[in-house]
Amino acid sequence: MAKFIQHIGLVAPLDAANVDTDAIIPKQFLQKVTRTGFGQHLFNDWRFLDDAGKVPNPDFVLNLPRYQGATILLARENFGCGSSREHAPWALTDFGFKVVIAPSFADIFYGNAFNNQLLPVTLSEADVDTLFQLVKENEGIEFVVDLEQQTVNAGGKSYAFEIDPFRRHCMINGLDSIGLTLQHEHNISAYEKQQPEFLR
């Protein structure tokens, strides 16, 4: 996994609360088990006016020219609620998002995001309100999300966020569960050598 230390990116404001996983990636697109190819179906029922996904909805935020290429999604409370599907962070990352900022996240989505190198940043509702206003008033504004410092820098101000130290360590060092295990490979090998022959 790639290391996540700091990210600078264009911000897209999704001004809706309780965005569930079925809105993020509708169930009809869940047949695949690989992590790629889901970005084209991200927010499918909102991004497109037809079932085939060929007629863009000109009013949806991700279709607006000013937000093309956004890598930071600004959202409202309880983002990622609904059914447990890892496809939701897969779709967001495949579309190009690196960070989601919101006042709160559904627990399962929150964990799945970290497992897929998508950083969920929790800020207060007041701070998120300020950031929405900032994005709407300043076309092309970029945020600096610094995981080492645990800050979001925008509009000349810094907004601090909390994060579990273990998850922070994993993202900064680009470690998934396999990478974490390999960090202790020498200890595992030493333990195995101490075992009786028939257990090796």
Curated annotation (Swiss-Prot):
One of its GO terms (biological process) is L-leucine biosynthetic process. Coiled coil: none annotated. It comes from the Bacteria. Its EC number is 4.2.1.33. Keywords: Amino-acid biosynthesis, Branched-chain amino acid biosynthesis, Leucine biosynthesis, Lyase. Gene3D superfamilies: Aconitase, domain 4. GO terms for molecular function: 3-isopropylmalate dehydratase activity. InterPro entries: 3-IsopropMal_deHydase_ssu, Aconitase/3IPM_dehydase_swvl, AconitaseA/IPMdHydase_ssu_swvl, IPMI_Swivel, LeuD. HAMAP family: LeuD_type1. This is 3-isopropylmalate dehydratase small subunit. It comes from Yersinia pseudotuberculosis serotype O:1b (strain IP 31758). The lineage of its organism: Bacteria, Pseudomonadati, Pseudomonadota, Gammaproteobacteria, Enterobacterales.
